[in-house]
Amino acid sequence: MKQFKRFAWLFLLLIPLLIVAGCGKSSSSDKTVKIGIMGSDEKIWKPIKKKLAKQGINLKLVTFTDYNQPNAALTNHEIDLNAFQHTYFMNTWNKAHKTNIVSIGKTVRAPLRLYSKKVKSVADIKKGDQITIPNDSTNEGRALHLLQSAGLIKVNNKVKLPTPKNITQNKLNLKITAVDAAQTPRSLSDATAAIVNNEFAAEAKLPNKECIYKEKLNKASIPYINVIATNKADKNNKTYKKIVKAYQSEATKKLIKKYYHGLSVPAW
């Protein structure tokens, strides 16, 4: 009886140690990965987060409100991945900030669109009207090329990323104003038209009927395919590759179609 009691006490003393050991094993097997996204993309990523949890990957969604934050956070290792930018934006950022951010997987193609609450077609735009465009260098240049494609202006085609200073013809004397990309939907209350990136258009719930012109999906738009990005040192990370694979699924294609109604289309 005494021997049984001795073993019983020993077992009770070991229980806390066994619990701690068990918890340690569980936490080490779960991999936590932080990915930076724009707020409008949460509804796409939440089902992917659930799917990855079954594989032992804890995907944390970190939302941002403008284009300057996600790459800075990635470089500073505040997040591990981001999924908000196209290749051209990423390359321009790397050059300007001397960083080594690389793509590890394609997400969507998102044609840039010209919206208006005041006119129903490009032909209705009048002399002296105001048009707002994103002010980051990549999307500003892209927006000016879109206005040229719409027949509203001409730019110096020798310049890859034109600014308003590179406009060579503006017959309607349009007032082209560059604002923060996140503010372009709001500018529609004052401006005749605005070029709005798809995530901000989705967030503002801009109806398709207010789109009066959009970018063509062709070879010229390939650099504008959106990607999942990470720091170059982590490009071969196996867990990150599993996240890309989880995103690039038929289920995600259906979600993109459901929530974006053609604003974005799968690019893989």
Where are the language model's segments positioned?
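Beta->alpha turn/N-cap motifs
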Residues: 66-67, 77, 81-91, 180-181, ...
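A conserved helix-loop-strand patch within extracytoplasmic ligand-binding domains
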Residues: 104-152, 253
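Ligand-binding "clamshell"
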Residues: 92-104, 118-120, 195, 203-216
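C-terminal motif of bacterial Sec signal peptides marking the signal peptidase cleavage site
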Residues: 18-22
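Periplasmic-binding protein-like
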Residues: 106-115, 140-148, 202-239, 244-245, 247-268
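Short, polar/charged alpha-helical segment
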Residues: 38-63, 69, 73
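Short helix-initiation/N-cap motifs at beta->coil->alpha
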Residues: 61-72, 159-186
